[in-house]
Amino acid sequence: MVDVLNIESLDLEARGIAHRDGKVLFVEGALPGERVTVQTVRRKPSYEIAKVEEILRPSSQRVAPRCPHFGVCGGCAMQHLAPAAQVAIKQRALEDTFWHVGKLKPARILPPLYGPTWGYRYRARLSVRVVPKKGGVLVGFHERKSSYVADMRECHVLPPAVSRLLLPLRAMIAAMSAPDRMPQIEVALGDEAIVLVLRHLLPLTDGDIAVLRAFAAEHGVQWWLQSKGPDTVHPLEREHADALAYTLPEFGLRMPYRPTDFTQVNHAINRAMVSRALKLLDVQPQDRVADLFCGLGNFTLPLATQGREAVGVEGSKALTDRAHEAAARHGLGERTRFATLNLFEVDVQWLRGLGYFDRMLIDPPREGAQAVAQALSLLAPGERPRRIVYVSCNPGTLARDAAIMVHEGGYALRSAGVINMFPHTGHVESIAVFESLDEATVLQAQAQARQKAREEAERLAEAAAA
């Protein structure tokens, strides 16, 4: 059945949203404001998924996708939408999530942070598959919503130097001893090097090593090898062990890293994000600052250039060790301290044990920082950070944690905005600023939270006894 629909909005999977007979329809390939004919491909009791058959009235924000693989490759979802419109949709999604999850509205919306629209992806995981029906080896991202590897010949979100490697990598893998046992190549670009990490399930032969070295010499890349888990990753050539690094020129910092370490995908936006975070945090020379989920010290070291002391906390000792080394190399060893701790299991006593912080930066993974938010909400007015900047890659967990800090802890959500870290995708990176309110308001919020918790415990006890 073919329907004619008016598209009302867009979700973060870049599907148009329409309604018909009280049912929601998610329409692949449609944009807000468009009138389209669609074919339903999946029916559920409360919604349907459809695809566009014909665009009867196109959106003024529709643009021609640059990539010939768009729509098949799962690496991008929004190339058919103007970049400014992509950011506007992400900003609306952030605001909607704050309200629906946390019943919160930021007092101020920060202007979006923009960066390069193309060639920005300095870190990527490429899958490798042998597919005889498609001519042999494929190297690229998965197809959209599929486990199949897309038949990619170019990629415009990868830097051009990496995009040009896609076809040569196919030929290289095909020339090796066991191409069907090499499932993955990770890409990591530093400011001065391109590193490729080959995942191989069988030992490499001398011939394989020769092929890798010839490829590296021809294309100007460096190979690292991974035979099992992350701890087996090592450079093919020993002299390449310290080649990868990114810079934060505003703070005079060079940050070395390993190719499988977490670093931000978009180096240009990372520089802008660090700069904005520190401006929002407004660190003073006498301030002691915490950086939770600090990783390699992406924020910790810049913070140490401005405050009295920066304390980085992270769950991986390997990362905190390297952050400490980087701080020492920059002469920041006496102004930094690092601790290894699982931040998903902390409590208020642990937080008190670290001492008083004037400011705090939180930059968690997608799971958010619920335990940290709960601990912060329990701190007394005189023992809590006055200002907190929270950098998030998941609006849902940010809104959840914000609700705890505001409704239970007496913080105010002063401002929030999006960071266009991942153009053409549905990923939403954002930043939010919280400030502790006056003592009376904090104590009132904490008392109300305790009362609500008691009432909920009584309700559960009554339900269990019934």
UniProtKB/Swiss-Prot annotation:
Enzyme Commission (EC) number: 2.1.1.190
Q: Which of the seven top EC classes does this enzyme belong to?
A: transferase
| Span of the signal peptide | none
- Positions contributing to [4Fe-4S] cluster binding: 67, 73, 76, 155
So where's the catalytic machinery, residue-wise? Answer: 393
A Pfam family per the record: tRNA_U5-meth_tr
Q: Which GO terms describe its biological process?
A: rRNA base methylation
Q: Which reaction does it catalyse?
A: uridine(1939) in 23S rRNA + S-adenosyl-L-methionine = 5-methyluridine(1939) in 23S rRNA + S-adenosyl-L-homocysteine + H(+)
Q: Where is the TRAM domain?
A: 1-54
In terms of SUPFAM superfamilies, this protein maps to: Nucleic acid-binding proteins, S-adenosyl-L-methionine-dependent methyltransferases
- What's this protein's family per the entry? Belongs to the class I-like SAM-binding methyltransferase superfamily. RNA M5U methyltransferase family. RlmD subfamily.
Question: Which function does this protein serve?
Answer: Catalyzes the formation of 5-methyl-uridine at position 1939 (m5U1939) in 23S rRNA.
Annotated protein name in UniProt: 23S rRNA (uracil(1939)-C(5))-methyltransferase RlmD
Which organism encodes this protein?
Bordetella bronchiseptica (strain ATCC BAA-588 / NCTC 13252 / RB50)
